[in-house]
Amino acid sequence: MAKARVYELAKELGVDSKTVLEKLKDMGEFVKSASSTVEAPVVRRLKAAFPKDGGNDSRPSAKKSSTPKSGAPAAAKPAATPAAVAGATPATAAPSAPKPGQRSNTSAKPGAHNTRRNEQTPRPGQNGGQRGATARPHAPGKPGANAGGTRNGGKAAPTPHAPQHGGNRGGSNNAPKPGANAAQHAPRPGNNPFSRKQGMHTPTPGDIPRPHPMARPTVNNNERRGGGNGRPGQRGGFRPRPGQGGSGAPKPGSWGQHRQGAGSGGGRPGGNRFGGGNGGNNFQNNGPSNGPSRGGGRGRGGAAGAFGRQGGKSSKARKNRLAKRHEYEELKAPVIGGVRIPTGNGQTIRLRQGASLADLAEKINVNPAALVTVLFHLGEMATATQSLDESTFQILGEEIGWNIKIVSAEEEDKELLQQFDIDLESEELQEEADLKPRPPVVTVMGHVDHGKTRLLDTIRRTNVVAREAGGITQRIGAYQVTVDLEGEERKITFLDTPGHEAFTAMRARGAELTDIAILVVAADDGVMPQTVEAINHAQSAHVPIVVAVNKIDVPGANPEKVRGQLTEFGLVPEEYGGSTMFVDISAKQGTNVDKLLEAVLLTADAELDLRANPDMDARGATVEARLDKGRGAVATVLVQSGTLHIGDSIVAGTSYGRVRAMLDENGKHMKEALPSTPVQVLGLTSVPTAGDLFLVAPDDRAARQIAEKRQATERAAQLAKRRKVVSLEEFKKKFAESEIDMLNIVIKGDSSGSVEALEGSLMKIEVSDEVGIQVIHRGVGAITQNDVNLASVDKAVIIGFNVRPNRQVADLAEREGVEIKYYSVIYKAIEDIEASLKGMLKPEYEEVTTSHSEIREIFRSSKFGNIAGVMVLDGEVKRGTKARILRDGVTTFNDLEISSLRRFKDDVKSVTEGYEAGINLGNFNDIEIGDVIETFEMREIERK
């Protein structure tokens, strides 16, 4: 015998499957779903226990329906016979509505049941239709005050006291109340398997589940929307039983129940009211009604159609005009590469450097995948998040009708700072009352070995020259001195720039930071290449120049010659009618140095307005930066405006941090740095690049975010530069470059400016098209283990400029075979790298003739073939060398080899001039007497 399933037991017990599942769970039997099987012992226990708990909901109680409680003796009046109801007038057909305090369950007395059967009581088959027409007026005003017994299988049962505020709202006050007879003849639960009602409670309209939109076609559901909703005893939405008339059709003699303005189900008062009438019919309007019914319309209090189409017009049909216009524009958009993209009308779009297709798609409101397809259609392959260069964006913009502009790094950085409420332009516009005088910033420029550092030593009374490697300056030095001008102490900030040609960037940086430039020219050398370069830097920065003609005490000095040479570059002395001040000095002897300082201050007072606001946040530039072993990152900064304090959060390029300490050029601690003051700052997280502007951020968090966003921007820009459009010609060029031998170099230096200068000088070395230099890494600080590992993988050479590794790193480099070269003077490093490049060139060979031998006799051997008896005319014949045959001065055979060389019967390695020998040319036997055997070899020549 098959096991019973849960839904079968529910049908047998007359309850729903959910109730059975809950009961099984209470019994300790956990089943999964209604389709699960149940064991026979559990079935018996369920059937034995269920009538106690579920019988009240599934089986009616005849005793309760026939025996009223003692609290309602007047409740038997509404149980009048239908005949009396039919013969009465509308005003007197039924007693008045019960008062609030009466029970809603008006069961008849014991004798009322027989009386109703004798007076044409409708049969059980007609009970549902009668109840649908007469039960509605009895409904109370509150939704929860249902008539008793309607939830219990249609039988009348006592309910708690429910006051009926508002009386009978249906408009048929004379309709009889439902009696006990209607509940007496209801079918037993579970007898009819095809009935919708299997002993379960009759659901009220609020409990009836909405049908699925696809379950059946749309019907007239006014009984759910209008007055048919919420009335007890009404079975709106259920099909009538067989043998039963239409649910809204009145019985003979009962037309008085259907008043004007009320539907067959006793709808809301007033037939012309929205939603009134047709409470009892399902598919057609059988009852009279004054007002037209709105089939499918939502009545007052009805739901918005959560499960069907009863809720009125669908929200999907209510598309706004903007959405329709957007769809129309998309349909009008041209198809490019198989996708539709709305083209622009030449509008300008600004993108950052290193932007991707996703950034562009966000600007023009399209799908990034569509832009990838269009770019692929144009012959370019890129992902949505890949950084692209400006040329690629321009090609794409021309195709889709947009003018794409890549913003510069300065504009992008300005927009970044504005996000943190930092506006550099507005801070430059200071009020006159806030501006105070500041010292001038003077840069000393000129050719190498013309005495720039010696001049500063004389001014500062120091000896920096003695501490410099090679006697040349290789970094920018910043100093501040106090001079006496007409009894007044004045401060001057000096920047000492290198004069070597490798430090062009440093000189340009010094010219941008300075107020006045001192051009030092040696009286014996005159104008030199770096002198001209310094003049160009100063003039491009619009900086006034004071010329110091140095070394006037050296024999052969000619200051007038220097003045004449400088007039060619626009520097005309005042004595010649110009505006440039010339001072003849001797830095070594200290001659006229005070006059030079006086000229600098006069120029500053006459031509410049040197004022700044010391009360604002500090702004300035990074002059130099290095990595100190004990202090970490140390940056030499020049404060241009504001005051820098200890504890300020600063950002310098991609580096950030908090000022932990400040030192002057002499190593003394400072608490604050005023405008035009050079100071060494400690506390940065990394070494900034020389020339980066620094500023004070509101807090540490803002400083870190600014630095990180700058790092991301630089990284994206670098990735965009690496990706370039490769045409066929460029591909051939790249393929040719792949055959070039590259010298990989790792550069480590003591300061960022020195590393920058060394890298720039090395990249300018040009030896040949066959070799090149590639700097795979550069950094500031000592040589570390990571540098050695990187050089080992890429077979690179490490150059340490004024830095050295520790013992462990040196041992690792020796084990890995990594070469480390140490330099303290930049031009020595350049010379060695240039020599290394020349050594990497492929060797070139030239042919050198070594001897001539004349054949005078031919010996024939069955084992060795023909053997030539020769006389060595010149040079030296060696065994294994290349040879050729000359017959009558014409080369007849080439690429021969002397395989055997004998003198008499002995094998020899070589035979010199004037001796006879026997020569065997291997398998070659076509020789004649009188031929000349010429030997030669390929010798390597030096590449220059």
Swiss-Prot record:
Q: Does the keyword Nucleotide-binding apply?
A: yes
Question: From start to end residue, where is composition biased (Basic residues)?
Answer: 315-324
Q: Where is this region: G5?
A: 586-588
GO MF entry, a single one: translation initiation factor activity
Residue stretches of biased makeup (Low complexity): 63-101, 281-292
Q: Where is this region: G2?
A: 471-475
| Annotated Gene Ontology cellular component terms | cytosol
Locate the residues binding GTP.
446-453, 496-500, 550-553
Region of interest (G1), residue spans: 446-453
List where in the cell it is found: Cytoplasm
Q: Which Pfam families match?
A: EF-G_D2, GTP_EFTU, GTP_EFTU_D2, IF-2, IF2_N
Q: Where is the tr-type G domain?
A: 437-609
Has UniProt tagged this entry with the keyword Glycosyltransferase? no
Q: What is this protein called?
A: Translation initiation factor IF-2
Organism lineage reads as: Bacteria, Bacillati, Actinomycetota, Actinomycetes, Bifidobacteriales
